[in-house]
């Protein structure tokens, strides 16, 4: 979000809980009560739907719907130099994107055989993400300025999941779940405990979905936050932000490992998208991605945004989203390759099947 869209407070940010990391297993044991039938792991599903929980990186219109209902103007939208409903560029922004459209989950859906529709939940779709969502329960106040005079109340990720489960009691293995958040928690954190809380919250969000029958996941971690335009100008802001992202990612990775181990009889597919490593790779070698600028925002500038990584001070361009989508699609393809290799009894699977966390973007447009 640009500096004019400044978050001011959250009514649902996590409370301090002592000894959180040591309580992972106990929490998950108390949290898990629902039996799930194992699926045939030899035949990966053709995803017919994608359900998204997250923040502004995945929002496709929920915040814009709220602002339109309250103020008669869609923000994000052309009024604030964003493509309609999304915190990124598009054909209706200045400058305009020419080659890409939509946030990463929309672009990911377009690569899948069934091409599942991505639409904001307030419009009847399955994208429950809201800009400025935190990882916890409840709601947050998202301000469009420096005070709460122009603001909307958004659902945090825990609340997003609760809303989804309230109307979707049955989950099939043809549904891919995306759970991505944490940046707003970190940008508003006042202590290391706040960062750890965010990772714990996200772990419990994932386990709650598993308890309800979800088995197919894409779970991105956070990029090095100190490298975004808002924070990359000085070591005093960039270094702590990146260290916070590293800590959050460590807690999340540990939590995912616990979820995987605790539910090993359920054949979960918890694919982790290593955005931290991916962004470091992009910024180290931008020309490999046909990018010319990976440090500044392109919003309102006389530049080609398709050659920039960032649109505003925090969010990627649609080209940046394209790289994320391509990487996520490769993770899915690698997973299918490994499972088909296992089913065929191959002892030396194809090299493309190696590893679960993809960082390369060989399928991206160069």
List each language-model region with its residue ranges:
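Intrinsic structural disorder/low-complexity segments
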Residues: 19-22, 343
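N-terminal secretory signal peptides that target proteins for export/translocation
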Residues: 1-17
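Low-complexity, intrinsically disordered or signal/transmembrane-proximal segments
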Residues: 16-19, 37
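Bacterial N-terminal signal peptides
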Residues: 21-32
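General secretory precursor processing signal
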Residues: 7, 16, 26, 340, ...
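Conserved active-site regions of diverse hydrolases
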Residues: 38-366
């Amino acid at each position: 979000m640009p500096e004019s869209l400044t978050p001011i407070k959250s009514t649902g940010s996590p409370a301090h809980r002592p000894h959180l990391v040591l309580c992972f297993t106990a929490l998950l044991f108390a949290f898990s009560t629902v039996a799930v039938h194992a699926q045939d792991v030899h035949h990966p599903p053709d995803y017919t739907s994608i359900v998204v929980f997250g923040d502004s990186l995945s929002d496709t219109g929920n915040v814009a719907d709220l602002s339109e209902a309250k103020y008669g103007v869609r923000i994000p939208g052309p009024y604030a130099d964003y493509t309609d409903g999304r915190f990124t560029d598009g054909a209706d922004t200045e400058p305009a994107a020419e080659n890409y459209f939509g946030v990463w989950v929309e672009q990911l859906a377009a690569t899948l055989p069934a091409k599942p529709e991505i639409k904001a939940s307030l419009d009847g779709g399955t994208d429950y993400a809201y800009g400025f969502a935190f990882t916890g329960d409840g709601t947050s106040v998202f301000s469009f300025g420096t005070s709460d005079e122009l603001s909307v109340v958004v659902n945090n990720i825990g609340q997003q999941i609760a809303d989804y489960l309230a109307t979707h009691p049955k989950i099939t293995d043809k549904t891919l779940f995306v759970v991505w958040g944490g940046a707003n928690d970190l940008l508003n954190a006042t202590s290391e405990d706040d960062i750890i809380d965010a990772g714990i919250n996200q772990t419990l969000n994932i386990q709650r979905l598993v308890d309800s029958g979800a088995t197919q996941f894409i779970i991105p971690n956070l990029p090095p936050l100190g490298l975004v335009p808002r924070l990359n100008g000085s070591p005093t802001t960039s270094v702590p932000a990146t260290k916070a992202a590293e800590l959050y990612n460590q807690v999340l990775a540990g939590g995912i490992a616990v979820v995987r181990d605790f539910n090993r009889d359920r054949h979960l597919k918890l694919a982790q998208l290593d955005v931290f490593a991916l962004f470091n790779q992009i910024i180290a070698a931008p020309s490999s991605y046909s990018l010319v600028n990976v440090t500044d925002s392109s919003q309102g500038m006389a530049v080609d945004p398709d050659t920039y990584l960032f649109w505003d001070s925090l969010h990627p361009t649609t080209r940046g989203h394209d790289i994320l989508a391509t990487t996520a699609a490769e993770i899915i393809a690698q997973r299918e390759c490994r499972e088909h290799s296992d089913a065929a009894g191959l002892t030396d699977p194809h090299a493309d099947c190696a590893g679960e966390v993809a960082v390369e973007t060989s399928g991206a447009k160069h």
